[in-house]
A protein has these predicted regions:
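Short beta-strand/loop motif that positions the catalytic acidic residue
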Residues: 280, 286-288
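Alpha/beta-hydrolase active-site loop
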Residues: 125-145
Length: 350
């Protein structure tokens, strides 16, 4: 099985774009025209366009680009989602970044959102190995971000997206200026068995043929009270995201599979290796949530300390999904990103 760091996964040349970057395009190959779901309180950002890509291993990804109108912009944010998310969940964030002068490119990871599912049971979150996510990111960078979006490029990643960004860091050195990782999935919060134990159990189950089985029964509808959920303290954004999931359930997932869990644990454990940490070469700010009960804040802070180009800060009392949090937390995150990205205004191409 390929690991996240294997050179065999460096395959940018294999991506094929399926459509033009224009709202007026017509698909000539019979491919479904990409669409986005709008609900009350979650409008699609102005200037957002979308399309599909096919990766080198023949998986279809849905992507979106939202460049800044006008003659000047501050570069492009490559926005990386967490597990069980979709482009629509970030409409508000895309609009906020546009208002600050940044263009945005984002996409749905394989197996979730509007991208191709990997199992017949489409509600299960599944990958065979972590390197598949690196294929997705490389494809979008080479086929959308670099040719169609303005430099400089910055990564803004949440949770699982942060873990992927870290493993892609050595490949992004010559293209990405800086990365801001929000509550990255580097370790699980307290109360979860150790990564070593989970790794042994998940690997054993996978080798016994249970890789495509769910880790647990779906609990997507169990938490109904915004005050008690682990993701956000903001009632309005919580309700908006629930409405989105109810309106477009095909975009979202239930349980991850055993193979997904095994791949994540292997990727997290690699980041405890000194050689892996030494290869993290893009300047990176890790932002942790003070009230996070999903991922380990301490593990993320220790990684930042060990990185030669890393730093960290904490948003006190914020829950795991900081871009879905109350304004008093969310605005801090946006200000931090803005300051870390710096004054990188460039003239946009005419």
């Amino acid at each position: 099985m390929l690991s996240a760091g294997d050179g065999a996964l460096q395959l940018a040349e294999g991506c094929v774009r399926l459509n033009a970057m224009d709202r007026e395009y017509e698909m000539n190959d019979g491919t479904e025209k990409p669409s986005f779901v709008e609900i009350s309180g979650n409008p699609m950002p102005k200037n957002l366009v979308g399309g599909y890509l096919t990766t080198s291993d023949n998986k279809r990804l849905r992507y979106a680009v939202c460049n800044v109108a006008g003659s000047r912009e501050r570069g492009t944010v490559v926005l990386l989602q967490g597990r069980n998310e979709a482009i629509e969940k970030y409409f508000e964030t895309i609009a906020n970044l546009n208002a600050r002068g940044f263009g945005v490119v984002t996409f749905d990871w394989r197996g979730q959102g509007g991208s191709e599912r990997l199992l017949r049971e489409s509600r299960l979150g599944h990958i065979k190995h972590f390197g598949q996510y690196l294929i997705d990111l490389e494809c979008v960078m080479q086929e959308v971000a670099l040719p169609d979006c303005h430099p400089p490029y910055h990564v803004l990643a949440h949770s699982m997206g942060g873990l992927i960004a870290l493993h892609a860091s050595s490949r992004l050195t010559n293209t990405v200026e800086r990365m801001v990782l929000l509550a990255p999935l580097i370790g699980f919060a307290s109360g979860v068995p150790s990564l070593a134990m989970l790794g042994r159990l998940s690997n054993a189950a996978r080798w016994l043929g249970f890789g495509a089985r769910p880790v647990r029964r779906s609990t997507s509808n169990r938490i109904a009270d915004p005050a008690s959920n682990l993701l956000t303290s903001d009632r309005e954004r919580y309700a908006r995201n629930r409405r989105l999931a109810e309106t477009a359930p095909e975009l979202f997932l239930g349980s991850p599979t055993v193979a997904w869990l095994a791949a994540m644990i292997r990727a997290m454990r690699r980041l405890d290796d000194s050689d892996e940490i030494a290869a993290l070469s893009v300047p990176t700010l890790i932002v942790t949530a003070g009230g996070d009960q999903v991922v380990s804040t301490g593990t993320a802070e220790r990684l930042a300390y060990r990185m030669r180009c890393g730093s960290s800060l904490t948003i006190p009392m914020a829950r795991h999904e900081m871009l879905q949090e109350a304004d008093r937390f969310r605005e801090q995150v946006l200000e931090v990103f803005d300051a870390y990205a710096g004054d990188t205004s460039v003239l946009a191409a005419e």
